[in-house]
Amino acid sequence: MAEVRPAADDFESLEPSIKNIVEQDSLKWIFVGGKGGVGKTTCSCSIAVQLALTRRSVLIISTDPAHNISDAFDQKFSKVPTLVKGFQNLYAMEIDPNLGFSNLPEDYFEGPDMMSMGKAMISELLGAFPGIDEAMSFAEVMRLVNSMDFSTVIFDTAPTGHTLRLLSFPSVIEKSLGKILSLKNSISPFISQFGSLLGMQDLNADQMTSKLEETLPVIKQVSAQFKNPDHTTFVCVCIAEFLSLYETERLIQELTKSEIDTHNIIVNQLVFPSKREECNLCEARYRIQHKYLDQIQDLYEDFHVTRLPLLTHEVRGVDKILNFSSNLVTPYKP
């Protein structure tokens, strides 16, 4: 077999690891995303594990409808933060990103039947703003997560299109709720009259919008943090193939447009041919990947590019994730 140049010889300009993320204590929000099938969940869980070694408390949230973090950790998670087995400071939860405002729990609207009616009316009102229904569900999750005071929160996101929508939620909510709350004084007399007709003397706009008013400051804070590189960063995960590289470039352009920091790329599932064994398929695969690694080097010379190997086994369970995650901070050598 012809000798080939190791991929690890590339990318000398910046540390080829996520040490910069681990060592940046100010980071509050870390998003991990990319094209489907590139190993985002394994990378998300590995980042979470590495951060748990140095942070006070870490939460990983799956916003992917497939909810693969349960499979990765080999432990069932729900919409409530649950301690990951084997850790004292790492929690995981799974949320359904497709739930809308109407799916929020009843205790979101504290009070008697009047508030249930308020929920229905506000739901109809919010329906006039495209994207706000789904965004409000995300807003409630962010409000709860914010109140739990985790040191760092990692989002294991769905494929690229949904991820970009997720990141736009704070600005969607800020604009839409601002408009709704600005109308409150105008519609308040009509709501009071409507309540009187139904024999509900206490029904008023203040009660109906109280939760929205609680949510808006949190969302403004989160929106500001998302655009602050001291608090938020995005880790792009890809494989060394044309479609994945194309999707990564599109993602980075959108993140830049949205003013969201990104300076880490993880290239997953790389083949490192053995000099001891003949493997024509491995060498052919390596040469294809190396072509795209060269392109990544040219395109993203100001990024930390971490290379992860294609393994012969699944990365499932805490022990295997811990072992695999070491490649994120210590560059892999075949």
Curated annotation (Swiss-Prot):
Keywords: ATP-binding, Cytoplasm, Endoplasmic reticulum, Hydrolase, Metal-binding, Nucleotide-binding, Transport, Zinc
UniProt binding sites for Zn(2+): 279, 282
First-level EC class: hydrolase
A single GO molecular function term of this UniProt record: ATP hydrolysis activity
Protein's cellular compartments: Cytoplasm; Endoplasmic reticulum
EC number(s) from the headed UniProt entry: 3.6.-.-
Active-site residues, record numbering mapped to chain: 64
InterPro entries in the record: Anion-transp_ATPase-like_dom, ATPase_ArsA/GET3, ATPase_ArsA/GET3_euk, P-loop_NTPase
Gene Ontology cellular component terms for the protein in this record: GET complex
Annotated residues for binding of ATP: 35-42, 241, 268
GO biological process, one term: tail-anchored membrane protein insertion into ER membrane
Annotated family: Belongs to the arsA ATPase family.
Function: ATPase required for the post-translational delivery of tail-anchored (TA) proteins to the endoplasmic reticulum. Recognizes and selectively binds the transmembrane domain of TA proteins in the cytosol. This complex then targets to the endoplasmic reticulum by membrane-bound receptors, where the tail-anchored protein is released for insertion. This process is regulated by ATP binding and hydrolysis. ATP binding drives the homodimer towards the closed dimer state, facilitating recognition of newly synthesized TA membrane proteins. ATP hydrolysis is required for insertion.
Subunit record text: Homodimer.
Protein name: ATPase ASNA1 homolog
Native source species: Nematostella vectensis
